[in-house]
Amino acid sequence: METKGYHSLPEGLDMERRWGQVSQAVEHSSLGSTERTDENNYMEIVNVSCVSGAIPNNSTQGSSKEKHELLPCLQQDNNRPGILTSDIKTELESKELSATVAESMGLYMDSVRDADYYEQQNQQRSMSPAKIYQNVEQLVKFYKENGHRPSTLSCVNRPLRSFMSDSVSSVNGGVMRAIVKSPIMCHEKSPSVCSPLNMTSSVCSPAGINSVSSTTASFGSFPVHSPITQGTPLTCSPNVENRGSRSHSPAHASNVGSPLSSPLSSMKSSISSPPSHCSVKSPVSSPNNVTLRSSVSSPANINNSRCSVSSPSNTNNRSTLSSPAASTVGSICSPVNNAFSYTASGTSAGSSTSRDVVPSPDTQEKGAQEVPFPKTEEVESAISNGVTGQLNIVQYIKPEPDGAFSSSCLGGNSKINSDSPFSVPIKQESTKHSCSGTSFKGNPTVNPFPFMDGSYFSFMDDKDYYSLSGILGPPVPGFDGTCEGSGFPVGIKQEPDDGSYYPEASIPSSAIVGVNSGGQSFHYRIGAQGTISLSRSARDQSFQHLSSFPPVNTLVESWKSHGDLSSRRSDGYPVLEYIPENVSSSTLRSVSTGSSRPSKICLVCGDEASGCHYGVVTCGSCKVFFKRAVEGQHNYLCAGRNDCIIDKIRRKNCPACRLQKCLQAGMNLGARKSKKLGKLKGIHEEQPQQQPPPPPPPPQSPEEGTTYIAPAKEPSVNTALVPQLSAISRALTPSPAMVLENIEPEVVYAGYDNSKPDTAENLLSTLNRLAGKQMIQVVKWAKVLPGFKNLPLEDQITLIQYSWMCLSSFALSWRSYKHTNSQFLYFAPDLVFNEEKMHQSAMYELCQGMHQISLQFIRLQLTFEEYTIMKVLLLLSTVPKDGLKSQAAFEEMRTNYIKELRKMVTKCPNNSGQSWQRFYQLTKLLDSMHDLVNDLLEFCFYTFRESQALKVEFPAMLVEIISDQLPKVESGNAKPLYFHRK
C-alpha cells in the first residue's frame, strides 16, 4: 500500500486563533461510508490538534462530555467482531472487567509457558497476534488512581494486517480514523503521545503540519492520551527503540519475545514490579505496569511499537510508550542509539525527523510466523535544523512480502552523531548477512603474498652508490629479514618498490660486514695483531667448542656475496680452504659439516639460481644465454633506452639489456670458480703414511693364539679432545696473507657498448663508470680488511679518499700482467685498451705510465700474495698532513703489514739469499706509484670540472669521493708516505 504525504505550509498567524477555537472532542467516524475507493482503501488521515493551553494534571472538573472526548475509540471492521469500549460508568464494572481479563491472561500464560518449553527460540521473537490479550480495566483503574482522565484501550485478538479500521469519514480526500483534539500532540505512525513542545515529522501542531499515513501492519492503532505534557522530544530520548518492540535498555538487550533486562528483572517472570521490566509473556502485571503483548520499560528505557500509551508510569500495549523519556515509532535517531542511522535534532524543543517504520530484526525469526512489514522508499527528504514547521516527508510505502530484515545486524553499538546533517536513505536492500547501522572499522590490508625468505642479500643499494660512510658504517647486531632488491649499479632500470620479484630490505648495506652466500651475516672484529674474531650464532656452528676461533670458510665467503660479486669463488656454498697438510680428512669432514644449503636467487633475472656460473650466482637460463652471447660475439641492440627490466618473465624480451645486466653482475667466461681451492698440498690427496693404521680387531677367544696389546689406559673425552683442538686451532687460524688472498675482489665488467663510436667522451665515461663499480668493491674490501676496522670511521673514509686512484691503477696493472702479459691495459674483460684506444681516450701518456707499472710486474715476477699485501700498503700510503685521529692505530697497522710483506719475501724459495734486495725492489715500486697517481688525479680533476663541456659522465660514488678529495689535494693537505727518500 502507499502512503502519500502532502506538504502543508503554515496558514499564517490566524492558525493560532483557530487552534484555540477548536472544540475538544473526539469525533468517531461512521462505519458505512461510501466514499471509500480502491485507491484510498487503506489510507488514513490523522489530524491531531492541540489546544493552546495544557490541562492541569489534577483537574477534577469537567463534564462527562469532556471525559467522553478523551476516550479514543477503536473502529472495527465490518467482517470481524470487535470489542468496543464506549463508556465506563462505575468502578464496579471496571473491577469485573479486570477480573475477567486477569483470568484470561492466566490461561494465556499457561499456554505460553507450555509453548515456550518446546519452542523457546522460536517464541522469543514471535509476533503472533493470537497471543495478544487486552487489559483495559487495569489501565482505566490506573488512570483513576493517579487522578488522570480515564482512557480506554481496546484491541482484538486477530491478525495484524487485518486489524484496521473501516469506519471512515472523508477529510481532505483521505480516510480519517480519528481526529484527536487534546492538549497533547501525537506522532504520525500509530502516534505516540507528544507535548506541544515536542513534535516529530508528522504531528499536527500550530505550525500546521498535516501528514497522511497508514498503519498497515499494526493492531490497536489508536492513541491513549494523558494530560501530562512530555518534557523530552520524542525523537531525542536517551533510549530510542524501533518498531517491533526492539527495546534499548541500559544494557541494550530486549526484544519482543524476551523481557527487558534490568537488574531487578528476570527472564520469563510472570510478575513485574515497577522498577523491573515486564516480560512479554507475563500475564500478570502490577498496576503501574500494564503489558499487552510487549515489553515494558522504565521511564529511562521506553519500549515502542505501533501504538503509543503515555502516562506518568510504565504502560505498554505492544506499542511505543511515551514517558518523560519519550520514544517514538519506527527507526528514530537518538544521541545514543540509532539503528538505521537516521538523523535527529537536538534534545530540546527543536523539530526532529522520524523516518518511516522499519521492521526490527527481532520481529521475525526463522521458523516463526513472519509478519510482513512495509518497505519504505524515500522519495523526498528534508533536513531540519531546528525549524519546526518547515519539514514534511513524502514517502511511498510498498507492502512487499519479503521486506523483512530478518538477519540485519542492528547492534546497540551503532552510534551515529545526532547532529549530523546527512541521513542514510531508508531503503536498504538487506540480506540475511547484511549489517545495517554498524559502523565499519577498516582494518589495514594485509598483503596476501609474503616476502621471500632472505636467502640472498645484495649490498648494491643507493647508500653504496652515494655514501662512502654508509658502506663503512659500524655493523649492527641485528637487522630485518627482508632483502634489498637493487643489486645492480645505477643505469639499470629496477623494478618499482612494490615487493614484486626481489625481496626488499630496510637495512643499509653498512649494517653488515660480511655475508655468506646463504644470506648469513658475519661481523668481523679484527685486532691490530691480525687475529680475527667472528660473531656468529651458536646454533650455526657445527662444533660449539670451536667458537673461540672462526672457521676459514666464513672468511672465504665474506666477500663472495657482496652485491654483484655474489659468491663467485666457492659456488656459494661453505667450503674449507687452506688447511695444512697435517690435518686428516676425517677432521676436515667433521669441521665442514654444516646446515642445509639455502636457496639462492639469480642476480640477473631473479629466478632461482642453480649455482655459481662464470663467477656469479645465476640460473641455468642466464648461464646459457651469457655463454652464447659472448662466444657468438653478438652485437645486440636495445629497442628502448638500454634500461629494460630483466626479470624471470621479461628476460627474453631484450637480449641487449640482459647481456648488459650479466656483465654488470660480474659474469666472466674466464672467471675461476675456485681460484685457490685445492691448491695447497694435502687437500685432495693424502699421504698414506700420515694415516695411522687401524688397530687389529680383538681376539675372539684366548685359544686363537693371537696376541693383542690393549692400550694401558683409554683416554678420556677431555684428554682426547685437546690434540684435536690444537690441530684445528692451528688449521683454522689464518694468517693475514690468507685473509687478503680470500677477500680479494673479483673482476668487474665495464658494460662497454661496442655499438657506440670510440670517442674520448664515450671511453672516459665508460672508464668512470667502471671506476665507480670498482670503488664499491674497494670500500667493501677495506671494510673486511684485518685491522682496518680498528680505525675510526673518519680515518677509514679519509684513507680511501686519498688512495682510491692508487688502488685502481695498481689493480689495473695486475690484471694487465695476469691476463695480457702486460701487452695491453686490461681495464675489464669487455674493455681492453690497445695502442689505438690509448690514443682515442685522450690520456695516452697516463696509459703508458700504467703500462710501465705492469711491465715492472713482469720483471719482478710478482706473486699474488705479494700483490695483496702491497695493495694494503698503498691504502695506507697517503695521509693528511695534520695526521689521522687515531695515528697510533694507523702506524701499528701499517707496521704489521710491512712486516708481513717482509715475511712473504723471506719465505719465497726463489729469493733465497736475495730477500732484502727483493724487498727493496717491491718498496721502490710502491714509491713509484705516487708519481703516477699525482698525474692521474690531475687529469681526473680537470675532467671533473669540465664534465659538462667535455660530456664526460661521473657516477655518484666518484662524485662524492672527488668532491671531498679535490680541495684537500689542491690545498696540499695530502701527504704521501715513501719507503725511500728521493
Curated annotation (Swiss-Prot):
Positions carrying Phosphoserine: 249, 258, 282, 286, 298
Its main subcellular localisation, reduced to a broad class, is cytoplasm
User: Does the entry annotate any disulfide bonds, and if so which pairs?
Assistant: none
Give the source's domain of life in one word.
Eukaryota
Query: Region Modulating: which residues?
Result: 1-601
Concerning InterPro entries, the annotation shows: NHR-like_dom_sf, Nucl_hrmn_rcpt_lig-bd, Nuclear_hormone_rcpt_NR3, Znf_hrmn_rcpt, Znf_NHR/GATA
Which Pfam family, just one, is annotated for this protein? Hormone_recep
Q: What does this protein do?
A: Receptor for both mineralocorticoids (MC) such as aldosterone and glucocorticoids (GC) such as corticosterone or cortisol. Binds to mineralocorticoid response elements (MRE) and transactivates target genes. The effect of MC is to increase ion and water transport and thus raise extracellular fluid volume and blood pressure and lower potassium levels.
User: Could you give the domain comment from the record?
Assistant: Composed of three domains: a modulating N-terminal domain, a DNA-binding domain and a C-terminal ligand-binding domain.
What is the protein's given name? Mineralocorticoid receptor
Source organism of this protein record: Saimiri boliviensis boliviensis
Taxonomic lineage from the root:
Eukaryota, Metazoa, Chordata, Craniata, Vertebrata
